[in-house]
Amino acid sequence: MSAANWCENAVFYEVLVRTFQDSNGDGVGDFEGLESRLDYLQWLGVDCLWLPPFFASPLDDGGYDVADFLSTHPDFGSVEQLSHLLDAAHSRGMRVIADLPLNHTSIAHQWWREELEALRAIDAGTLDAADFTPRYVWSTTGEEYADARVIFEDTETSNWTFEPSVGRFYWHRFFSHQPDLNYDNPAVQEDMLDVLRFWLSKGLDGFRLDAVPYLYERHGTNGENLPETHAYLARVRAMVDEEFPGCVLIAEANQWPRDVVDYFGSEEAPECHMCFHFPLMPRIFLSFARGEASSIDRILADTPQLPAGAVWGTFLRNHDELTLEMVDDVERADLYARYAPEPRMRANVGIRRRLLPLLGSAEAVECAVAMLLSMPGAPFLYYGDEIGMADDIWLVDRDGVRTPMQWDGSTNAGFSPQSSYPPVLSTMPNVQAALADPTSLLYAHRRLIAQRKAVFDASDDWCIVASDEVFAFERAGVLCAFNVTAEPQSVTVAGIEVYLPGHGYAWVPLVDRVLPHLVGQRFYGGSADSSGVQIVRAESWQFGGVWLTVESAGAFYRTLVDATGRDLLAQYAAEGDDAAGAGVGVDVVGYVRGLLAERGHTLVGDVQAQRVGGEQSNTSFVVGSWVVKFQRRLAEGVNPEVLVADALADCPHAAHVVAHDEGACVATVVPLVDGARDGWELALERGLVGDDSGEGVDVAGLGAAIACVHAALDEGHVQRRENLLDCLRERMVRTGTQAGLGDALSSGLIEVLSNTGAGSDQVPVQRVHGDLHLGQVLWDSSRWVLIDFEGEPAATPAERAAEHSPMKDLAGMIRSFDYATQVRARENAASSSTAADAGAGAVEQATQVLLDGYRQAGGTVDEALLQAYLLDKALYEYDYELHHRPDFRYIPARALKALGIATPE
């Protein structure tokens, strides 16, 4: 194992051996049971297990009442079984630390029994008091150290308890059955060092040192943080560093950060590698209770700078009560009122409840966990909180938050049917059910942990930028924002408008993280230089991830991201059904189900989301009997596809929009053409017209389908031919100039456009498909269906909604014929040297069949205008291929040459 700095980035997970998993049918968790669940913990992303005391104990205080530091509790297993557990964890890349109660023992400890015997011997005169150094702290009056507070004030009235068998009072900072050790006795110091040596030599990776501020007592002090305590901890650290390098020490000191920081020690005398930040935890809950985050900001502002290599341990819940010692009376009253209105919900100066019952919703839990995982420090999670386990306020002390882990829906939740204590809860969220639901809190934990590891580092600086209803900070190129209220909130941070639902959060990757994943996406046409890119909006999406609106050169793009900056829809499409398990966590199915329900439609059955193949400027998925399309480029105005939905509702050859969303996610849903294949795929497989290499496709039927769609969209509008040609000319000049065609374009345009003036002065115009090609038509074995009426992706909504001659769609399809035949010819070139020429002949033949089918279905073909639109489309293709796919430039170049426009070789 490596040096002890491994803890700086680790995710810790507290697991009670007694209640995690039993292996031998006795209903009590044990080492072998825990070992059997290591794969689950590895899957979750846990780096280090934290085990509360597993030593021999009467278990009057959950094992913190130790009866023998050098043996294990027999119910949990043997020392050898523990060693096997440690080896199994290490083989999975996980470490294991344990609690060590340095301060006290149980009255069942042999040391205590020997102490009482010695004191009785002194009183009897059989032992010289000068030969006796007590292991515990005694008084004849019980009046010493009066300035030390009583910690468990609801069960203990004093830190002294009278022991009648010896006629003396003994000192205990905790329960009266846990007498404090006397660290002024050198033998106690050595014995406890030997305890550490024993377990570290067995393979433990460190200790959480329980209750370290109270090791020594001095008159006139509060008995906390004494110089002698720090001196002893420095001695412990020196031994660990020398004899067990790579092992860690963690201080449990429930005090203000300015006091706790001393437990890190100094450069000359280091003490603990980590310390818990106790005051932060209740202030996170206070922020959710009050709906304002300033209390978090204030405690962080009061937190001193850490020494190099030192790490705060942060947490939300653990095996103890949610301690409220480090808040004032007003804050404590607010916390009790919000989270523990019933007295049974309280313990000591705190609240004995689990995370989900405290915060009240999975959304609030996920928000709080995301906050914990993105803050500096090493986060500690508590077993069962990842599945939303409840608590039992009717159990004694803190046992209500220590109930058995719930693995499945069986009677005993995966434990053997023997009775267990604490008993299994009647409410049954469980791991098995959570694993079957990619939207579960469990999967959310896994995704958050994975993103934390991919993005954040212990050395990252951070800057708090908002602390009202939204707590926000910037760290490691990620803007982290958390809405601590139940109402939607927005805040502008670093120029980004951040929108969050109630108790929502967003990890917003900044430009340098997002841009590498954007460049190369089909929908992105912006700059590859971060100086030319700006994130203007971020919106947390309830179905997973954060929608970013990215601006570059006046264009706006949409990408759904996590903290790494990767595009989650692209990742989802790449990983398919395993996307949620791989950490993507986008619920496309749930989104479509809800969107359809709002419009009175139903998504039937247990369905998956499958990516629609082919290159698209948007991202589409088949979900059951529907297709959802996520818009990736934004512009002002109504989506053109929505505008024609009503007109196409009764057309059998059009997949029209039945539901759309203009909120955080801009998307449309259309019916799926069941069992259909797109025209591009068919053309490559069969050829356009029947020949020796393929049976061909129904091109005539395609022409008829296009005519049917045009008839549905026709509103009887006309435009002067001259005006239409002027618009086409202007567009073609602009496109050709971008492509560097220059004078060749000018002369070619004159020749082509001179032939378009013949015919009626009034030209029919209407809303058309606008981006028609073989990839936009589906064949279901009996009919063609046109899809995606959005128009040209690069155009504005106004341009896409503009009326054109129907010849625009026919020209687009004919140009697609050319591409399909050329690509097919290219694939068959090895076996046929004349394939390209044969392909050209196939295009001419298919074009004629298409136009005949169009006419027979009632469409009118304006041959002159068709030529103009063919030139316009070929110029657009040439410019696109020149800048994006140079290897395909030859296809539109051949078409331009046939139209009289020469292109560079």
Give each language-model segment a name.
Residues 543-733, 782-783, 794-829, 836:
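Conserved ATP-binding subdomain of kinase catalytic cores across diverse folds
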Residues 788-792:
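Activation of the activation-loop gatekeeper triad in protein kinase-fold domains
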Residues 600-607, 733-767:
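An alpha-helical support segment within catalytic cores of ATP-dependent transferases
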Residues 1-511:
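Active-site and adjacent substrate-binding regions of carbohydrate-active enzymes
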Residues 776-786:
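Conserved protein kinase catalytic/activation segment
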Residues 830-864, 868-905:
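ATP/Mg2+ or Mg2+-diphosphate-binding catalytic cores
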Residues 767-770, 774:
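Catalytic-loop of the protein kinase fold
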Residues 512-539:
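Short Lys/Arg-enriched alpha/beta "domain-start" segment
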